Amino acid sequence: MNYMDYDAETLFSVGRRFLNGDCVEKDVVKAKAMLGRAAELGHPLARKLLATIEENSPETADEMAEWNKMRSGEMYDWTDPVIDSSLRRSRLACEKFNRSGIDHDDYRHLLQEMVPGVADSVTILPPFHCDHGNGLHLGEGVFVNYNGMFLDAGDITIGAHTLIGPNCSLYTPQHPMDFRQRRKSLESALPITIGEDCWLGGNVTVCPGVTIGDRCVIGAGSVVTHDIPSDSLAAGNPCRVIRKLN
């Protein structure tokens, strides 16, 4: 059984032991991951202890090493405790958001919890799934239709007034070609950028590292593997420019 599957009280107790080095080897990263999970499950003392750690013991460069690699496009270990804690927090936030529905009184609050700092003019229709939420940078008036899948190990930036059709998938992480590296839980992530006033039709897939310029229209079912210049109508698998729009 994964220790992160324990109940809140057990997570709090074991996490505190990792923090203090009582009976187990001191491990602040693991302690924070366990206390964070306990806090997510509603343990009040875990929240207080975690806040104290954050105030008095800022994460060291070593603790954030894999996270920083992930955000900078380097190879990283996706099982790292800091990354794992973020993934778990995001899964819970997505579950709450998806259960609520857009007409729920707490829709805007739950959206903010899932995508921190998102503008009030942004609309995301549930169900929606993301890896971390804090890697999503959505401009004013962005609309995301049903069943969006945004894997934001790398940053995903979407410009103002862009429309994302149903069942669209934006993938920043990529596994290595070498199976030996895959066995070591290594992967990398490249950012995705979509400009302003774009429209992506339904079932579009955008691959790691792709930039789509402003005012582009991407046809339904396209798989975008390379950059698309601004003012382009593009479609296909792989997606290719059909013509200029202006």
Predicted regions, residues:
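Short coil/turn and helix-start
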Residues: 4, 22-26, 40
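TPR/TPR-like alpha-solenoid signature
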Residues: 5, 12, 32-33, 48
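Hydrophobic face of amphipathic alpha-helices that form TPR/SEL1-like repeat modules
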Residues: 10-20, 52-54
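Terminal amphipathic alpha-helical/low-complexity segments used for targeting or macromolecular assembly
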Residues: 31, 36-38, 57-121, 239-243
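TPR/TPR-like alpha-solenoid helical repeat scaffolds
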Residues: 44-59, 236
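Flexible, glycine/small-residue-enriched loop-and-beta-strand segment within the central core
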Residues: 128-139, 143-212, 232, 237-246
